[in-house]
Amino acid sequence: MRLSEYEHQILTKHCNALFPHSNLYLFGSRTDDKKRGGDIDLYLETEDKSNLFKRKITFLSKVKRDLGDQKIDLIFNEDESRLIEQEARQWGIRL
């Protein structure tokens, strides 16, 4: 996994604050230690869909404030038939 301990802490801190009782996964190229670069792809499983867009924007702004301007993609569990959700669940690393 190509996240520093600090990056891991920041992601989980803001996730727990804004999306309690949820599961956050890192997926995509950052899960492969042999690859370089790449954005931070996150998959979030949550049952609480209230104010989801506002909480997503708040999460991304707080993470970028703490980590600097990085490309971060955050997707939610919406439809388990979506290929991206299946890939994230199968190959993702829970944070």
Label the predicted regions.
Residues 1-25, 31-37, 46-95:
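Catalytic core of pol beta-like nucleotidyltransferases
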